[in-house]
Amino acid sequence: MNIKNEKIAVLYGGTSQEREVSLHSGAAVTEALKSLGYNVEGIDTKDIAIEKLKEKGIQRVFNILHGGIGENGVLQGALEQMGIPYTGCGVMASAITLDKFRTKLLWNAVGLPTADMVVVQRGQAIDINQIIAKLSLPVFVKPSSEGSSVGVFKVKTKEELLPAITAALEFDTIVLVEEFLTGAEYSVPVLDGEVLPAVQIIPDGEFYDYHAKYLSDKTQYIVPALTNERQAEVAKIVKAAYDVVGCRGWSRIDVMEDQNQNFRLVEVNTNPGMTSHSIFPKSAATMGISFEKLVERVLELSI
């Protein structure tokens, strides 16, 4: 069947902490598909129950929700129950990868490199001295299940650590305290199993937080950022990371270098941002893939 004859919904917005970013991504994706002649409707899931999609005659979904039910497997399961094909990862990969803790457990189990971490759960006693003894300072404190750097803190002093953990626990019941990696930061897109050129991120500020990601015009994105040899090295790690958690369609995997320039995996973004600041289209452009063609390719990969 020709997808252009189907009624397609771009799902965006929603109610997660990443709602605003998703609204921008959704608008861009909807406009791109319309420009290519698709029968497409943009739908903010804050305004409609998912089960109503079938009643509206929706035959296929481009899922560009960030965080929440759009990336944790709930939406994916509902769409499968209704028999509606959708873009991106399936139920299992979506559920696993929104949880940074369990993603890292899987990666570590197969020998993939990640930052060292201490896991803190809401309600448990927190031993600040023990954390510092293991990881030293500075450290990153982050909720296990939030994206877009929501609730992430860089902690430089012992006095800042407990307040940062307490604040992060407002967003999730599990918080990761991770060693601070001193090397360069990269984000590496994967499209239909092919690893695209890594994008180096030089943030406006101390780290790549929400402001640097979505609001600042001073954050620098360098692509291509690596020599062919280093790109091949990171691609091997990223492809293994993508496969072991069961990703499909498209995803973007964040990576950092440690002090010895070894790559360490950070996290997976199963519904990458598609705004004017977004990394995925910047990387795709170096391969001769326009924004519109990238959107169309992701849609074609929907199952």
Curated annotation (Swiss-Prot):
This is D-alanine--D-alanine ligase. It comes from Haemophilus ducreyi (strain 35000HP / ATCC 700724). Cell wall formation. Transmembrane segments: none annotated. Keywords: ATP-binding, Cell shape, Cell wall biogenesis/degradation, Cytoplasm, Ligase, Magnesium, Manganese, Metal-binding, Nucleotide-binding, Peptidoglycan synthesis. One of its GO terms (molecular function) is D-alanine-D-alanine ligase activity. It is found in: Cytoplasm. Binds 2 magnesium or manganese ions per subunit. ATP binds at residues 132-187. The keyword DNA repair does not apply. The keyword ATP-binding applies. The gene is ddl.
